[in-house]
């Protein structure tokens, strides 16, 4: 105190004419520190103390007058203290009262721990350094004289009062009181965000504080009035997100403790920041994850469905003296120890009926949901378009036709298209060689449901077709575009979806597709990428369609266009083969082949190459070109002979046109055919030979393992193999050359039905099969007449041929 009085820097008596008389000299210390006169009652209403304040301000503070004497009165150095200025128009020194706001340097002595009921006997003298009670703060007492207190400004709203609301604070479980004019009835709207020095700070988790009994509390309360054990012991971040969260001490160096006193002027409106407890916040969550979520919810609490003053934001609601009986502040008693604050039981449901919808979990659902985009696609896709959850990958090799379906490119794209970069505008859609744009049609589809045609950019090298790494399809829009399209991303590849409509015969004109060039460095640095962007500038338009089948499966067809050169430099320098007059030729060579394309020179070379399965070159030969017939768009080549003249099957090779060391065209295919291949007409052999079939034929013809190519009338080597059923078979182990009796059993014992032979064939007239007498084996003497033996059927011999 004495140090401050002796310091000339803080003596503003001359500036404000405090010491103009002897009486003022006596009252200077009290006036210098903003103390009221001893005779002024602490419970005097603010209207009497400050007649210059407007009526709304008096009304707001009338309810707090009863506690001002206890809450703010104290004794410092055996002198009376207060926080209310003297009433009347004449100041203690006899000077007239200033009508306009004035600046005072007031020594804020804080709340003495021996006389204030808000402080507890918690001794932290050993932990915290003592502060000198000579700290001066800036106070603007007559702020309300020119500002309507009913309309809270951002400076005096919740975000600037982090002791009452944590919407602007990163502290998740508690806040700190202010050893500044924030706790006085006269608050400055522009208080400094940092009233303590960095070295005066302490760890954020050492103290907890509730709401101080200030008559100027915020109309809304913080959800952090409930400090549970979990929230108290939780981890704290090192720095807050807002400078408004201040750490305060008493001027005696003691840390301020919690206050169990609620605000005397609670909010009349049901704020969502009241009674949001552990079990009502996100179900089973025991503590708020971060006050940033609460701040976001508070900022979004302007929805009319929450009954917050018809959609008026919380910070802009006008406070009145109508106390709502259904809303009360949730206050918990201070714990005996700073680290053992007991959890407080939740509110009763009957006391807070207005917040039952918050308990039901609708609070976060209403304010954290993202609305749908208000601008839908102008040309939406047909809802009947088929989409399968398990479609083949884009790098799968699919056929272009299957069964009755065929996907065909009716009009091929132009061989050159300048792709645009990401940093420049579009260069238009891909065009066709003869003008217009490419077109694709699905043949064989007779259903009435539309399908979706997928288009992506694929590779054009000699490897398997796959999505291109350096080029993507680009959707073109504009007045001249007649085809609807939609962009989609499939496995990091942009795909353009185009409807195929039955009314258009399942045909689509591709006037909505451009080509986008990606940056080489972005692609080349990918893991596993081996291609080089500047050497891979050719692409293909790949079209794919998925056709649903009646059995529930999906038939996927794919077709790729001719190569398209996307680089302007490459299109001007590299040769390009579009057509070739011959696709195959004999191994002897010597035939002519005409190539059509671009960038052909007089010294252009055509190289034929045969590759091994591993990619190595097995054979390479330069073809002879006719320079006198060479043109920039055509080239005449004589096919060279193949390396092996004795091939027995066609061999496929490749060839390319070369204009220089690194100026080569794409590989083209050519097939060598074997020379002097005899053309022999062969017929497949019949596995069923009825002429050599013997045995039971009631069940049809039986296959023979080995056909008999002897004379038609000769007996087989094993006569027992052709015996009818009823004859004993020949013993397998007998080596005797003696022949067995070949007499047939009576026909009645056969299994054949009447009118049919034992072989199942119709009987001729007389009941005897047409037969020829078999020659008698040599060495067998003639015996008595016997029944005719079974004969071999010859399908080529008619019954009349026996005569």
From Swiss-Prot:
Residues 184-279 are annotated as: 3 X SP repeats. Transmembrane segments: none annotated. Keywords: Activator, Cytoplasm, DNA-binding, Nucleus, Phosphoprotein, Repeat, Repressor, Transcription, Transcription regulation. CDD domains: RHD-n_NFAT. One of its GO terms (biological process) is positive regulation of transcription by RNA polymerase II. A motif (Nuclear localization signal) lies at residues 246-248, 661-663. Residues 101-106 are annotated as: Calcineurin-binding. The modification Phosphoserine is found at residues 214, 218, 226, 275. Coiled coil: none annotated. Residues 109-199 are annotated as: Transactivation domain A (TAD-A). Residues 418-425 bind DNA. It holds the Pfam family RHD_DNA_bind. Phosphorylated by NFATC-kinase and GSK3B; phosphorylation induces NFATC1 nuclear exit and dephosphorylation by calcineurin promotes nuclear import. Phosphorylation by PKA and DYRK2 negatively modulates nuclear accumulation, and promotes subsequent phosphorylation by GSK3B or casein kinase 1. It comes from the Eukaryota. GO terms for cellular component: cytoplasm; nucleus; transcription regulator complex. Residues 778-792 have a biased composition (Pro residues). Residues 214-231, 793-803 have a biased composition (Low complexity). Sequence repeats lie at residues 184-200, 214-230, 263-279. One of its GO terms (molecular function) is DNA-binding transcription factor activity, RNA polymerase II-specific. Residues 181-195 have a biased composition (Polar residues). Its main location: cytoplasm. Member of the multicomponent NFATC transcription complex that consists of at least two components, a pre-existing cytoplasmic component NFATC2 and an inducible nuclear component NFATC1. Other members such as NFATC4, NFATC3 or members of the activating protein-1 family, MAF, GATA4 and Cbp/p300 can also bind the complex. NFATC proteins bind to DNA as monomers. Interacts with HOMER2 and HOMER3; this interaction may compete with calcineurin/PPP3CA-binding and hence prevent NFATC1 dephosphorylation and activation. Interacts with TLE6/GRG6. Rel Similarity Domain (RSD) allows DNA-binding and cooperative interactions with AP1 factors. PANTHER family: NFAT, NUCLEAR FACTOR OF ACTIVATED T-CELLS, CYTOPLASMIC 1. Plays a role in the inducible expression of cytokine genes in T-cells, especially in the induction of the IL-2 or IL-4 gene transcription. Also controls gene expression in embryonic cardiac cells. Could regulate not only the activation and proliferation but also the differentiation and programmed death of T-lymphocytes as well as lymphoid and non-lymphoid cells. Required for osteoclastogenesis and regulates many genes important for osteoclast differentiation and function. This is Nuclear factor of activated T-cells, cytoplasmic 1. It comes from Bos taurus (Bovine). The gene is NFATC1.
